[in-house]
Design a protein with these regions (language model features):
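Short glycine-rich, Thr/Ser-proximal phosphate-binding strand/loop in the N-terminal lobe
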Residues: 12-36
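Glycine-rich, often acidic, oxyanion-interacting loops/wings at catalytic, nucleic-acid
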Residues: 131-221
Length: 354
């Protein structure tokens, strides 16, 4: 006999619904605490009963998954983005959501999310953290330039590039001469911004070093970096979010996972392909598209493909580069599956398989 349990988890409380054939649905509410979850599941388990648990993916779902793995027979982490049509009801409560999850689990209709191991989740989190540091550096630089322009300094003093070491020293000198009058308050602000910039740059250096060292432990990294134009940042993101290449049985599924396949709108005899779905990890999608721009300059076959898709129309450049990015993912999937190094023959050999 099986019990299907749905957890509706938020930061403070968890609502559990137990669905079992021939019995009335049962609800329980408790604090979002691993020990209380384990105690609840222990109460539900009997020698002849198998517990099947589901809850939605969230920031804490990985930790919950690992902690409860030994308390139930199976755990399914659901994708709420693919269940929006199910939740379209006039009434929405935590109890209703928990029951819907349990019922969907009982009929095998939960859109499942792949749950990687802890070290892979930490790898992904570090990649995302580094990306945010890079974004913070860009924001601080833009604020510094805007501040200097607001006081009439429209260009750097030493070289054309604002961010050379010489210009950085020049900005430090500007910030080092504040007076006590309000007219020079901008210099204090500049000093704070330069301190922020130095801190972010130090953090970027440290996180990059850590990621570089970890990437060296991945056997597939050197394989992917044989593709001209693909460096360590793209490689680590692809490997971290791919995790297990065997879970992608087709090229289309691999490209769709990273949100690079077009949306489909079909009705009757009308079939329309729209913009790319942009689902999945945005960090990989952005990096692989940036890599595609570099690859078309170094790979004759992909350059030819890019030009064929563009068809001599400059306004089709973005469409063409997205097509190249899909080809890159197809090549990467083939390389990770077969262990082959990159060569131009791979493009014609694997890129037209589904």
């Amino acid at each position: 006999m099986s019990k299907y349990i749905g957890f509706d988890v938020d930061s403070k409380k968890t609502v559990a619904c137990v669905v079992q054939k021939g019995k009335k649905d049962r609800y329980t509410t408790f604090e979002t605490d691993i020990e209380q979850m384990q105690n609840f599941l222990k109460q539900q388990s009997k020698d002849t009963e198998r517990l099947h648990l589901t809850f939605e993916v969230s920031g804490q779902s990985g930790y919950i998954h690992d902690s409860l793995l030994n308390s139930v027979h199976t755990i399914t982490v659901g994708n709420p983005a693919k269940m929006t049509w199910i939740y379209r009801t006039a009434k929405k409560t935590d109890r209703i959501d928990a029951r819907k999850q349990a019922v969907l689990l009982s009929i095998g209709e939960i859109p499942k999310v792949h749950m990687p191991k802890k070290h892979v989740r930490q790898w992904r989190a570090t990649i995302q953290h580094r990306r945010k540091i890079v974004s913070s550096i860009t924001q601080v630089k833009n604020r510094i330039r805007a501040l200097l322009k607001s006081v009439g300094i429209n260009k750097p003093a030493v070289t054309k590039n604002w961010w050379t070491k010489a210009n950085h020293n020049w900005m430090l000198q500007l910030a080092a001469r504040p007076t006590e009058t309000i007219q020079s308050a901008w210099q204090l602000t500049l000093a704070d911004m330069l301190n922020q910039l130095e801190l972010f740059q130090l953090q970027l250096k440290q996180r990059t070093k850590y990621l570089d060292q970890y990437l060296q432990t991945q056997p597939a990294a050197n394989l992917i970096m044989t593709i001209p134009g693909i460096g360590p940042r793209t490689t680590e993101a692809v490997l971290a979010y791919t995790d297990d290449i065997k879970r992608f049985s087709k090229n289309k599924r691999y490209c769709a996972y990273f949100g690079l396949t077009p949306r489909l709108d079909e009705s009757g005899t009308t079939r329309r392909l729209g913009h790319i779905s942009k689902q999945g990890p945005s960090v990989v999608r952005w990096l692989i598209v940036e890599a595609a721009w570099r690859v078309v300059k170094k790979s004759p076959s992909l350059k030819l493909f890019f030009e064929r898709v563009m068809a001599g129309q400059k306004n089709r450049k973005k469409i063409a580069i997205i097509a190249v990015a899909r080809k890159l993912l197809t090549i990467i999937r083939a390389m990770l599956t077969t262990g082959e190094l990159f060569n131009e023959q791979l493009i014609s050999k694997y890129c037209y398989q589904q």
